[in-house]
């Protein structure tokens, strides 16, 4: 997010004027004169491309798209204007010039769905939002929209953040008409705040909040920070509770943090404490918070679209909302914090921009405190590029984004007999894979018998060794099946064909004597995203009775694009953004370098500055899938790293030997950073009804907290999701928001934008995410709320160079 320079432009011809008025009296004083900014934008005519019987609009100079799932994916220009902290926007006037229109012959392509990572996909996922596509109104409703937040600018200064989305293209789905403008002029009127509530110089940079029982072991960290020039103070929870009031203990702590910003000029807040027991502890008093069994209490989000709440430490960092007011995360004062469910009028309006860089060390006892303090001090005092300047990435194929091939073989008029269906795929390099053969009987006197199969792993030579030649597999009919006298339809569920509910690529269908031949085609190698597949059918005499092909069939291995170094739709994977002096070790399922935990552990044992896992997770394990997910997830999955296992070694993380060569770990997936579990709460949740996400496997601590608190070994810090993670299938996996966007943004902020302090990188990722995607979809809200930093927010990445 960069500050912009603006100039006033006088327009001579206006075609349309729109103004949004706001309460002009609220938050203003006679000492705050009205100010004005005018922004002028010029847009080029769109280029139209056909895609899957839809149209896509591409326009040079646009930096975003509408990514609200199922709604028309129109180009957007998004910009964030940095204004003084606490400004009051009066109104924004939009003037447009030169409106033109074009009529399309096909619908605009819908924005991709956000899929819960690792969870079965609902069969009612709408590919198109019918409320929009069946409407006779232009979408979006206006040529622009905006939202105002309060957070930190590029220089870590408190500011108001005005994000404006301009929509030069608006679409009427009923008439299939696109209106577009060449010029948009925005005039913004606002009042400056009358006073600055923050000190010019900081008394303290870092405040550590901890229970009294941890202060003795934390004093070493306080002394260390002060010695290296990070002015640090420690405050106990008991002291805070005795001095502050609030509806509960989390709010008392939040008020203390607010005072720390306004009185001391604090930049970083470190919370030290998790649950108080590994065996059993009560994770929450009610739907809003947990305190009694917590060293440091937690706030739960009540975003209920996907799960019954999750811990959000963003609550402690998001202090202010528009006009600089305190944001208590209960905007409608109904006593339910951070409530969100669908499009309910009861949803709380949240700012979500962090106003301070905040992290947590979720220690449960003094031994864990000693371990993490020891690692932090050693890390910052012993910078060593020989092991730090290396990045490890681990990933595979996140989703089975197979297109619906749907070859239609019309058997009308064909004689009874045996027929052999052949399929073969070829990649752009001209390499052909093995031929898949399926023998069926055509006999209209018999009952139809069709069976689904998913055994493409049998086609891959030496499975699971990769890379391999292209794969073609017919799934909707099997050897020995009978095409008979009656119709047949079967839709395999997620347990048989992952993501089939979304694509329908595996549906078994025989109707009106037409067999719909469906299956998979993919190229199992790094970045092998396109293949051509040919299908032909011979009768018992070897005569071809049917042949067809599908060209440029796409399948993306989402996690590999997120972690890799190539560009996709003008956004690259993590390695692309890293400094040139960094080396990389790429552990992908498609390159054959990741086949199990030993590959990951051996690589981490050598030490590295960063490890990026992008895939599927839970509180006890992380993994992903082989390319194409052969045999579906049960066969096609591979474990990357677990804290608890059912066979030896029972605690795989403990096998790490990377003493004091501790990486910053970014993990993409569900619940890896969930830290409100214990051994008994997970053991007793056999069916998952208590949402511990371990399904009866006793897990005393979550994946990220375990990796972070290990003595000497493991991570120096971990960033991941406390709740469900979301992903985007296929080609928009790095651009379309949620997990694939925010995780790669970390490396953009560190490697390209140059942020060196851990908490500032984390804070900037959340800020940029909200700038780019806003807060309209619940998956966007959950992405930023649940993305927690386990580590010291004031940590100098790589340590301090003593020279």
Where are these regions (language model features)?
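Short, solvent-exposed loop/turn segments at the edges of extracellular beta-sandwich modules
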Residues: 426-431, 524
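Extracellular and select intracellular beta-sandwich modules with Ser/Thr-enriched
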Residues: 432-438, 446, 529-531
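Solvent-exposed loop/turn segments flanking beta-strands in beta-repeat/beta-sandwich domains
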Residues: 524-537
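Structural beta-strand segments of beta-rich domains
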Residues: 511-517
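Surface-exposed, short loops/turns at beta-strand junctions within beta-sandwich domains
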Residues: 412-417
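Cysteine-dependent hydrolase recognition
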Residues: 24-403, 430-431, 436, 443, ...
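Aromatic/hydrophobic beta-strand junction motif of beta-rich domains
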Residues: 409, 461, 517-523
């Amino acid at each position: 997010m960069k500050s912009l320079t603006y100039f006033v432009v006088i327009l001579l011809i206006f075609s349309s004027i729109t103004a949004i008025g706001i309460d002009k009296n609220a938050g203003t004083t006679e000492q705050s004169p009205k100010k004005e900014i005018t922004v002028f934008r010029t847009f080029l005519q769109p280029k139209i491309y056909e895609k899957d019987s839809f149209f896509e609009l591409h326009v040079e100079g646009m930096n975003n798209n509408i990514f609200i799932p199922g709604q028309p994916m129109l180009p957007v220009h998004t910009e964030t204007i940095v204004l003084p902290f606490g400004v009051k926007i009066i109104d924004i006037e939009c003037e447009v010039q030169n409106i033109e229109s074009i009529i399309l012959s096909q619908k605009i392509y819908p924005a991709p769905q956000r899929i819960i990572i690792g969870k079965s996909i609902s069969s009612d996922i709408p590919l198109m939002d019918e409320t929009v596509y069946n409407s006779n109104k232009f979408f979006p409703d206006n040529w622009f929209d905006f939202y105002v937040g309060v957070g930190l600018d590029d220089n870590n200064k408190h500011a108001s953040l005005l994000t404006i989305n301009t929509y030069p293209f608006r679409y009427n789905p009923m008439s299939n008409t696109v209106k577009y403008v060449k010029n948009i002029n925005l005039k913004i009127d606002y009042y400056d705040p009358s006073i600055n509530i923050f000190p010019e110089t900081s008394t303290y940079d870092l405040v550590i909040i901890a229970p009294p029982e941890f202060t003795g072991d934390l004093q070493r960290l306080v002394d260390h920070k002060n010695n290296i020039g990070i002015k640090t103070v420690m405050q106990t929870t008991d002291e805070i509770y005795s001095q502050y009031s609030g509806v509960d203990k989390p709010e008392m702590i939040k008020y203390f943090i607010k005072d720390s910003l306004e009185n001391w000029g604090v930049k970083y807040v470190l919370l030290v404490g998790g649950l108080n027991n590994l065996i059993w502890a009560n994770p929450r008093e009610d739907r809003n918070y947990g305190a009694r069994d917590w060293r440091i209490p937690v706030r739960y989000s009540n975003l209920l679209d996907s799960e019954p709440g999750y811990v959000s430490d963003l609550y402690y960092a998001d202090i202010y909302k528009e006009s600089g007011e305190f944001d208590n995360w209960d905007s409608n004062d109904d006593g339910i914090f951070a409530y969100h469910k669908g499009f309910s009028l009861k949803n709380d309006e949240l700012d979500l921009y962090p106003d301070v860089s905040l992290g947590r060390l979720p220690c449960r006892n003094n031994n864990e405190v000693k371990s993490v303090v020891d690692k932090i001090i050693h890390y910052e005092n012993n910078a060593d590029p020989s092991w730090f300047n290396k990045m490890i990435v681990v990933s595979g194929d996140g989703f089975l984004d197979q297109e619906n091939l749907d070859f239609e073989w019309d058997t009308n008029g064909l004689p009874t007999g045996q027929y052999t269906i052949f399929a073969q795929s070829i990649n752009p390099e001209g390499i052909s894979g093995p031929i898949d053969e399926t023998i069926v009987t055509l006999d209209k006197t018999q009952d139809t018998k069709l069976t689904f199969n998913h055994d493409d792993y049998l086609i891959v030579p030496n499975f699971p060794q990769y890379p391999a030649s292209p794969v073609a597999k017919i799934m909707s009919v099997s050897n020995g099946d009978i095409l008979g006298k009656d119709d047949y339809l079967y839709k395999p569920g997620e347990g048989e064909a992952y993501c089939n509910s979304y694509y329908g690529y595996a549906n078994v269908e025989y109707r009106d004597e037409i067999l719909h031949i469906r299956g998979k085609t993919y190229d199992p190698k790094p970045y092998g995203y396109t293949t051509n597949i040919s299908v032909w059918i011979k009768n018992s005499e070897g005569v071809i009775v049917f042949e067809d092909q599908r060209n440029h069939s796409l399948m993306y291995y989402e996690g590999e694009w997120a972690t890799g170094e190539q560009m996709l739709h003008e956004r690259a994977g993590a390695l692309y953004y890293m400094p040139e002096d960094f080396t990389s070790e790429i552990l992908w399922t498609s390159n054959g370098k990741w086949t199990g935990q030993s590959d990951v552990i051996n690589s981490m044992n050598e030490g590295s500055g960063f490890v990026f896992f992008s895939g599927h997770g839970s509180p006890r394990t992380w993994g992903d899938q082989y390319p194409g997910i052969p045999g579906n997830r049960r066969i096609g999955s591979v474990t990357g790293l677990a804290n608890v296992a059912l066979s030896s070694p029972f605690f795989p993380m403990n096998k790490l030997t990377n003493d004091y060569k501790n990486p910053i770990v970014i993990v993409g997936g569900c619940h890896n950073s969930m830290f409100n579990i214990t051994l008994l709460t997970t053991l007793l949740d056999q069916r998952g009804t208590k949402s511990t996400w371990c399904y009866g496997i006793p897990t005393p601590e979550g994946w990220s907290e375990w990796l972070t608190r290990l003595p000497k070994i493991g991570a120096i810090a971990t960033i991941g999701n406390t709740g469900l993670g979301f992903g985007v299938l296929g080609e928009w996996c790095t651009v379309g928001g949620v997990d694939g966007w925010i995780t790669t943004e970390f490396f953009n902020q560190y490697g390209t934008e140059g942020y060196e302090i851990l908490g500032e990188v984390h804070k900037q990722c959340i800020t940029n995410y909200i700038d780019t995607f806003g807060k309209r979809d619940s998956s966007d809200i959950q992405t930023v709320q649940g993305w927690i930093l386990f580590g010291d927010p004031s940590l100098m990445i790589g340590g301090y160079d003593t020279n």
